[in-house]
Amino acid sequence: MEEEIAALVIDNGSGMCKAGFGRDDAPRAVFPSIVGRPRHQGVMVGMGQKDSYVGDEAQSKRGILTLKYPIEHGIVTNWDDMEKIWHHTFYNELRVAPEEHPVLLTEAPLNPKANREKMTQIMFETFNTPAMYVAIQAVLSLYASGRTTGIVMDSGDGVTHTVPIYEGYALPHAILRLDLAGRDLTDYLMKILTERGYSFTTTAEREIVRDIKEKLCYVALDFEQEMATAASSSSLEKSYELPDGQVITIGNERFRCPEALFQPSFLGMESCGIHETTFNSIMKCDVDIRKDLYANTVLSGGTTMYPGIADRMQKEITALAPSTMKIKIIAPPERKYSVWIGGSILASLSTFQQMWISKQEYDESGPSIVHRKCF
């Protein structure tokens, strides 16, 4: 037995849950944040049907289940299902006893206070963890990039945030949230593929479209020009084989889909695009720190994985910012998991060890201790 017990790091996203051990360089378990319940009564006796399935098992049985996501727009909305996901994480994915390990959880920026308390309560009362901590996702992504100052544009499956951070502290007055993320882009791709004559409607088919999106979509540097290219030649067309063997062809949809990040009007939304939201977030900060934010704009989350997104961000923010400003967009290759990686780094710092909320402190102060110790 090593002299120190490894901390567990769990990053609960709207789309995927990333879990593993502090000090590891990547999460051991990555599975969909889904809980599925059977749609039909089981007819086979002795089949051992369960009343609920979590993660990949729910995904593989999706044809007979109703799938629910307990985390919407980055924030937990269904605590019973969330508890099932945590239970699955500890016992089935990581195969650990939660009462033996400190647990580092992540939360969305601007997470309601009651939610942090509820997370704390479940960890100590349901899972009996010896210690826990709740960290803000974007701050962890910044740590993972080796910085303590910068602005993080974190875009996952359910929500996008721009979070300016100065010397390790998020600046809450300048955090902006955009309810436009991966799931919306998947829905949009479903819609524009329907216009091509391919029909995708069920939750199971949505997963196929998500795969098409992840494999074939990219961000155009110049949207109008790319549209013209797509119209005049077939050079941008790619084919994709569906599970039943049918092959579909996809052309301008490849870049029209993620273009909605820069032009939310494509989705019928009135909000600003991710470039403008990032700029607005910077402008809400003190004039003296803006220079540091422009030069340290870090992309994080699965929805920033499109090829071409960093160049396009650079171009768009350069157009908005003062002309002399040095602008640098940092897009680490591991950014899909940078929140988790930042958590792993944090949990293994010697200086962090006194930051954990212990079971004893929780027993003395109750769930509100989380506001005093995690900021």
Swiss-Prot record:
Alphabetical keyword list: Acetylation, ATP-binding, Cytoplasm, Cytoskeleton, Hydrolase, Methylation, Nucleotide-binding, Oxidation
Methionine (R)-sulfoxide, modified sites: 44, 47
UniProt-listed InterPro entries: Actin, Actin/actin-like_CS, Actin_CS, ATPase_NBD
Gene Ontology MF terms: ATP binding; hydrolase activity
Modification type Tele-methylhistidine: residues: 73
Catalytic activities: ATP + H2O = ADP + phosphate + H(+)
Keyword Acetylation attached: yes
Subcellular location: Cytoplasm, Cytoskeleton
Post-translational modification note: Oxidation of Met-44 and Met-47 by MICALs (MICAL1, MICAL2 or MICAL3) to form methionine sulfoxide promotes actin filament depolymerization. MICAL1 and MICAL2 produce the (R)-S-oxide form. The (R)-S-oxide form is reverted by MSRB1 and MSRB2, which promote actin repolymerization.
GO cellular component: cytoplasm; cytoskeleton
SS bond partners: none
Pfam families found in the cross-reference section: Actin
N-acetylglutamate: residues bearing it: 2
N-acetylmethionine PTM positions: 1
Known function: Actins are highly conserved proteins that are involved in various types of cell motility and are ubiquitously expressed in all eukaryotic cells.
Protein family per UniProt: Belongs to the actin family.
More info: In vertebrates 3 main groups of actin isoforms, alpha, beta and gamma have been identified. The alpha actins are found in muscle tissues and are a major constituent of the contractile apparatus. The beta and gamma actins coexist in most cell types as components of the cytoskeleton and as mediators of internal cell motility.
Subunit annotation: Polymerization of globular actin (G-actin) leads to a structural filament (F-actin) in the form of a two-stranded helix. Each actin can bind to 4 others.
Name this protein carries in UniProt: Actin, cytoplasmic 2
Species for this entry: Anser anser anser (Western greylag goose)
Gene name of the encoded protein: ACTG1
